[in-house]
Amino acid sequence: MANYPQLNKEVQQGEIKVVMHTNKGDMTFKLFPNIAPKTVENFVTHAKNGYYDGITFHRVINDFMIQGGDPTATGMGGESIYGGAFEDEFSLNAFNLYGALSMANSGPNTNGSQFFIVQMKEVPQNMLSQLTDGGWPQPIVDAYGEKGGTPWLDQKHTVFGQIIDGETTLEDIANTKVGPQDKPLHDVVIESIDVEE
């Protein structure tokens, strides 16, 4: 199972634990610097510097994902710590399972500060068989079957962490009433992110 760190809720050596405090409750994640070093460094540095403090989840689509990390709350903003967009860090060890922490982008190698948390609870049966045929590892296909997720985003968005506590908060946020462009009618705010290394 060591190959697929998302399948283990314990924080392993080399992983980083972060707690995201929101006005809807807390979510705890473990991050994977061995899998996505630049992405994790970007997120952790932003978290420590307070970059994400006060930023909202500007796009919420129930049974798909919640997206945040944009200081402009438009979906168009946000910068990386590297001064520009940075490259994708795809891996055959991390997948867009339910609860995955993944980078939002506008195409290949356009990562900035925006991220999303996967919240799709069920993968259709016909898609699961396509995953098997497509060469996805069996433990991951099984996890998609048990937990849900968005496998069509694999190898398109960098997965750099996984929720390990606070799924009820994730669900509460996902069930927020939204208006145009999937923006919550009442702000869902990231108050702070604590990094426990």
Swiss-Prot record:
One Pfam family of this chain: Pro_isomerase
Residues annotated as domain PPIase cyclophilin-type: 14-195
Alphabetical UniProt keywords: Isomerase, Rotamase
Domain of life where this protein originates: Bacteria
Signal peptide coordinates: none
Gene3D superfamilies to which the protein is assigned, alphabetical: Cyclophilin-like
Reactions performed catalytically: [protein]-peptidylproline (omega=180) = [protein]-peptidylproline (omega=0)
EC number(s) recorded for this UniProt protein: 5.2.1.8
Keyword Iron in annotation: no
GO MF annotations in UniProt: peptidyl-prolyl cis-trans isomerase activity
Top EC group: isomerase
Keyword Cell inner membrane among record annotations: no
Family of this protein: Belongs to the cyclophilin-type PPIase family.
Role description: PPIases accelerate the folding of proteins. It catalyzes the cis-trans isomerization of proline imidic peptide bonds in oligopeptides.
Protein name: Putative peptidyl-prolyl cis-trans isomerase
